[in-house]
Amino acid sequence: MNAPAAFESFLLLDDKKFYIEKDTKVPNAAIFTIMKEDHTLGNMLKIQLLKDPEVLFAGYKNPHPLEHKILLRIQTTNNTTPADALTTAITDLVGELSLLEHRIDAAIKKCTQSGDQERGYN
């Protein structure tokens, strides 16, 4: 079979995880290559970046289904850099995911407690 081995989709051998390339076609833009990632991270970052008023453009693509990397293109205003916008987006995403985790844990705890009460375990 011509497909790469399954472990190649997540195991980062001697390669870097992250590359930055200045985009010379448009002002104040950069292309970030993130290795061993897919649409899950790409779409979350794109949506979070587009919430920032300093970001003029944010988009990503997976060059080929058998290549496990995403290319994230960011263009910002002159007030910030693409790297700063990405850092802010990642920080905001971590906060949102922490809040989601807390809410899920609270809901599970509430369900298990109500289930225990219905069964007469308390």
From Swiss-Prot:
Belongs to the archaeal Rpo11/eukaryotic RPB11/RPC19 RNA polymerase subunit family. One of its GO terms (biological process) is transcription by RNA polymerase II. Component of the RNA polymerase II (Pol II) complex consisting of 12 subunits. Gene3D superfamilies: RNA polymerase, RBP11-like subunit (3.30.1360.10). Pfam families: RNA_pol_L_2 (PF13656). PANTHER family: DNA-DIRECTED RNA POLYMERASE I,II,III, DNA-DIRECTED RNA POLYMERASE II SUBUNIT RPB11. It comes from the Eukaryota. Signal peptide: none annotated. Keywords: DNA-directed RNA polymerase, Nucleus, Transcription. DNA-dependent RNA polymerase catalyzes the transcription of DNA into RNA using the four ribonucleoside triphosphates as substrates. Component of RNA polymerase II which synthesizes mRNA precursors and many functional non-coding RNAs. Pol II is the central component of the basal RNA polymerase II transcription machinery. It is composed of mobile elements that move relative to each other. RPB11 is part of the core element with the central large cleft. This is Probable DNA-directed RNA polymerase II subunit RPB11. The keyword Coiled coil does not apply. InterPro entries: RBP11, RBP11-like, RBP11-like_dimer, RNA_pol_Rpb11_13-16kDa_CS, Rpo11-like. It comes from Caenorhabditis elegans. GO terms for cellular component: RNA polymerase II, core complex. It is found in: Nucleus. One of its GO terms (molecular function) is DNA-directed RNA polymerase activity.
